[in-house]
Amino acid sequence: MSLTESVKSEREFRKRQAFIGREQDILSVSESLMADKGVRKVSVNTIAARTGIGKGTIYKHFDSKRGLLIAIAERHYSTLFELLGRPTDPAQALSDWIEARLSGARQSILIRELTETLADDQRALSKIQESQIRMRKRLAQVLTGSSTTRGESMERAMWLESLVQGALVEMESPLKSRSFDVDQWIESIRRVASVLSSQPKQSEKDQRLTYL
């Protein structure tokens, strides 16, 4: 590679990194604004004003507000997927995943709200669902230590997710007890996750016998 080509390559790399960094900034600011004000009350103009990035530049990253919402949801599930990616320490991976879901309750609630906002857009929902399923499959693998993500493995993942969702609903409830303690909930769900991951996986034959 000549010096000129090397300089050009380096320039392109820096340009690409700046683009990625700016995109992440847009997503983070959008997420914060929407968590505070609600998805429908935050416009692209509002995001542009808060980030100091021109509206036209934002549209270079996302073709519409809907595209921005999809990207926020995809990033959310991708982050959870990465937290579960510790093959050498699955117990810690599960613990980090649970804490991220409950300590970051505002974010989890935001994802639900923006998903409801996109309820009439099947293509958007399909893209978000792909990210969710990818994360759920990883969760199933971590819980059972199995490469399969069907049957009992997926059931365990869904049980754990249901517990987390229940805790999030309780956090939002106007009937929430004054003594409600997020840390206690996190610890309780960690114990449940430990039980789920320590239970031996039934063979397919055993599972069939359960229903006889």
Map each language-model feature to its residues.
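Alpha-helical DNA-contacting segments of helix-turn-helix folds
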Residues: 69-76, 131
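Amphipathic alpha-helical packing segments from all-alpha helical-bundle domains
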Residues: 81, 96, 122-148, 154-158, ...
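Basic, helix-initiating cap at the start of DNA-binding domains
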Residues: 1-37, 41-50, 67
